[in-house]
């Protein structure tokens, strides 16, 4: 099992309840893939460094999790097909 960190930015047109539902969805993907969620940090709505998809702000969320090496590929796929996600990144934490 390895430690990973993901940050995603949700579209600002969503309300906070919809963003919380997305967080639960991604936590479910991690837990269904035999991973464990170590920490969830919802940063709220923040200004983007540059315009993405014609928007200047978004809801930031950081999730730290422990999982097998195959799980980030599945999580990346789910991020890609989920409406409302502007950007995401998954990185392996250094030991």
UniProtKB/Swiss-Prot annotation:
Gene Ontology MF, one: small ribosomal subunit rRNA binding
Pfam family of the protein (one): Ribosomal_S6
Keyword flag Ribosomal protein: yes
Protein's UniProt keywords contain Lipid biosynthesis: no
Keywords: Ribonucleoprotein, Ribosomal protein, RNA-binding, rRNA-binding
Gene3D superfamilies: 3.30.70.60
One GO BP annotation of this record: translation
Superkingdom of source: Bacteria
GO cellular component labels: cytoplasm; ribonucleoprotein complex; ribosome
Protein family according to the UniProt entry: Belongs to the bacterial ribosomal protein bS6 family.
Physiological role: Binds together with bS18 to 16S ribosomal RNA.
Protein name: Small ribosomal subunit protein bS6
Native source species: Clostridium perfringens (strain 13 / Type A)
